[in-house]
């Protein structure tokens, strides 16, 4: 499993309310993204926003971030996002009452 963090600076005309409304509008569309397990839409008072994504594979993540999604981010926010990838070693899910250990290396 891969976790990716994506961040971009919001332009001045996109405030908290506009960002929240946009995220609410686009969230259902991520149900169809191949290899995406989950996405958290995030916002900070510092004026940065983005997402924390859980992916099945690094290949799925890289394919998504290099496609039309990237063009949309650059067009909407006026900058290329910062994207970092992390290998997940273990996942504690308190909502489901589970702990999952990932023993096969993904990145290293």
Where are these regions (language model features)?
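A common structural junction motif
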Residues: 71-75
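Short S/T/G/P-rich N-terminal loop/turn motif that feeds into the first structured element of a domain
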Residues: 1-48, 58-66, 77-108
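Conserved RNP beta-strands of RNA recognition motif
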Residues: 51-55
């Amino acid at each position: 499993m891969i976790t990716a963090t994506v961040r971009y600076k919001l332009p001045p005309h996109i405030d908290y309310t506009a960002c929240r409304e946009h995220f609410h509008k686009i969230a259902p569309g991520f149900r169809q993204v191949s290899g995406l397990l989950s996405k958290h839409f995030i916002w900070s008072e510092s004026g940065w926003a983005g997402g924390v994504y859980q992916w099945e594979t690094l290949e799925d993540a890289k394919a998504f971030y290099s496609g039309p999604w990237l063009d949309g981010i650059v067009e909407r926010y006026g900058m290329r996002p910062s994207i970092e990838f992390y290998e997940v070693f273990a996942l504690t899910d308190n909502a489901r009452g589970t702990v999952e250990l990932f023993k096969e290396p993904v990145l290293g």
